[in-house]
Amino acid sequence: MGTVSSRRSWWPLPLPLLLLLLLGPAGARAQEDEDGDYEELVLALRSEEDGLADAPEHGATATFHRCAKDPWRLPGTYVVVLKEETHRSQSERTARRLQAQAARRGYLTKILHVFHHLLPGFLVKMSGDLLELALKLPHVDYIEEDSSVFAQSIPWNLERITPARYRADEYQPPKGGSLVEVYLLDTSIQSDHREIEGRVMVTDFESVPEEDGTRFHRQASKCDSHGTHLAGVVSGRDAGVAKGAGLRSLRVLNCQGKGTVSGTLIGLEFIRKSQLVQPVGPLVVLLPLAGGYSRVFNAACQRLARAGVVLVTAAGNFRDDACLYSPASAPEVITVGATNAQDQPVTLGTLGTNFGRCVDLFAPGEDIIGASSDCSTCFVSRSGTSQAAAHVAGIAAMMLSAEPELTLAELRQRLIHFSAKDVINEAWFPEDQRVLTPNLVAALPPSTHRAGWQLFCRTVWSAHSGPTRMATAVARCAQDEELLSCSSFSRSGKRRGERIEAQGGKRVCRAHNAFGGEGVYAIARCCLLPQVNCSVHTAPPAGASMGTRVHCHQQGHVLTGCSSHWEVEDLGTHKPPVLRPRGQPNQCVGHREASIHASCCHAPGLECKVKEHGIPAPQEQVIVACEDGWTLTGCSALPGTSHVLGAYAVDNTCVVRSRDVSTTGSTSEEAVAAVAICCRSRHLVQASQELQ
């Protein structure tokens, strides 16, 4: 695969110069020396122009995107993405059409790569003056300017991720990831290092930019420290997590640890093509790099994930919201932040690990001992979210070796389930990010674990909505997950509740902002439940003092979640919480002026119960948790009055937050209860009893 390196700008060519390029030997040779065989390119475009009619000049419906971080932009190189249903042959036809129309206007363009296996589109080098023309071409969905990506690196780590039963001896987990292949997109790798010798295949793939301040590439073997270290963390003989996993190395970062979005996309397509040509067992792709938010990068990750590939990436080392970076912001990617030996967030000078709702979990990422490229027996200590991501890639390889049929959703849920919980000091994170950032540090599952029919659930937060009254936020579950409940949260308390809606064949959680509000979050409880069938039952506002109630009507369906939505701006106060009458079926109870929604599901062996915890006096926080063996599927506040900020699930605990009672003058009439719905599968109970 060729190297994509040049980043020079393109300028319009006047007709005399264009003729000179076509006819003048000296001019043609000069241009060839600079940019390759452009004389042939121009002649070809003349021929192409004769054979292609211009498309009708409709207004552009496609959109243009570029990196929000100006220093990382690479103007002059663009990824043109075609619409989803576009036939494969149209990628090359559209590229030729662009070249022909650009040549007619006196511009040269160069097609650097045509995507066939990852997404429909192509990579083109051209003047920014041609963007309007390109956006009007048939089949074009959007165009994204290329941008830079960077490596994210600035033996306690193995002990931290190992279950307690292993620690008395040494780190020797079963199977060692031998059934899994890990692709590493990084710098090159010193494959003869004793840690990884015989475990790594360095592919011939290379797509890296020129180094800053130079006009050449150093040999890969002269700058393979980052990739060598990460390869050792994943599967090194002494310091590796998955000692049996095999690695394949793709070079997408240069000697300065810098690459491009386009180069990484071509690397991902290389993996997809390899997967199609020679299908193998489970694949893990490690992306220990970060760039600014990129729609096309995230879309490519989604395509690869839906093809069955597990992608693990670094959250980034910018002490910032991970949702502002790619591929960390891609929902289909497992995004990993970094912690130190004390399970605290890693600080790197004035920066540190990224955080926020786009992070799935944390892993060891400070002073990690691994292979050094200085010599074949050298080791070095490195820090960063790249190292943390390498740990999780190793754990993923271990899990997939034990259960090769796991889907991405099942693997992610297990990573979350077996993580160490509530060990990170949240004060390190900005105040507005603490509730959004998962307090989880990755760990291997115990060897005696049997997943069976265990019910796994996780909490997914939406992006923050806008501040207008009609603004909404939407939280979505992954492709193989089921939305079992929906809640909302607003720091100002000004919200109009939430409800489950159907969108594109999937259920989503939609939260509603209120007048004067600062925005709202939607919070989805996403679970793995085979053969599940769910529906929503709604009761309109009762208008009576007893409140609004609704329960599951269909036989065999059980209550998995409650939500409420109201149109009035202020629900006002409510007498002490109206709890579920004892002895009656599980039901959702809410404010008399609110519509109440019950999420009702049927699945083999599924049983659920409601747990409530109310405090007579107003409290800023009320919690209720499910017992061992039960999984939290629903979390709501009762009643959902306007002084309640919202409800959300943290692992197996339902948390209800209210306004600061010391400043609001709240009374006992504004007391609130936390309502948890806890579910389990009888199949799991029976299986556990049989093992005892």
Swiss-Prot record:
One of the record's GO cellular component terms: lysosome
Domain Inhibitor I9: 77-149
Cellular localisation: Cytoplasm; Secreted; Endosome; Lysosome
Keyword check for Transmembrane helix: no
Modification Sulfotyrosine, positions: Y38
One GO molecular-function entry: low-density lipoprotein particle binding
Protease among keywords: yes
Stretches for region C-terminal domain: 450-692
Keywords, ordered alphabetically: Apoptosis, Autocatalytic cleavage, Calcium, Cholesterol metabolism, Cytoplasm, Disulfide bond, Endoplasmic reticulum, Endosome, Glycoprotein, Golgi apparatus, Hydrolase, Lipid metabolism, Lysosome, Phosphoprotein, Protease, Secreted, Serine protease, Signal, Steroid metabolism, Sterol metabolism, Sulfation, Zymogen
Membrane-spanning segments: none
PTM notes: Cleavage by furin and PCSK5 generates a truncated inactive protein that is unable to induce LDLR degradation. Undergoes autocatalytic cleavage in the endoplasmic reticulum to release the propeptide from the N-terminus and the cleavage of the propeptide is strictly required for its maturation and activation. The cleaved propeptide however remains associated with the catalytic domain through non-covalent interactions, preventing potential substrates from accessing its active site. As a result, it is secreted from cells as a propeptide-containing, enzymatically inactive protein.
UniProt-listed GO biological process terms: apoptotic process; cholesterol metabolic process; low-density lipoprotein particle receptor catabolic process; proteolysis; regulation of neuron apoptotic process
Means of activity regulation: Its proteolytic activity is autoinhibited by the non-covalent binding of the propeptide to the catalytic domain. Inhibited by EGTA.
Peptidase S8 domain location: 155-444
Entry domain remark: The C-terminal domain (CRD) is essential for the LDLR-binding and degrading activities.
Function: Crucial player in the regulation of plasma cholesterol homeostasis. Binds to low-density lipid receptor family members: low density lipoprotein receptor (LDLR), very low density lipoprotein receptor (VLDLR), apolipoprotein E receptor (LRP1/APOER) and apolipoprotein receptor 2 (LRP8/APOER2), and promotes their degradation in intracellular acidic compartments. Acts via a non-proteolytic mechanism to enhance the degradation of the hepatic LDLR through a clathrin LDLRAP1/ARH-mediated pathway.
Protein name in the entry: Proprotein convertase subtilisin/kexin type 9
Organism for this UniProt entry: Macaca nemestrina
Gene name tied to this protein: PCSK9
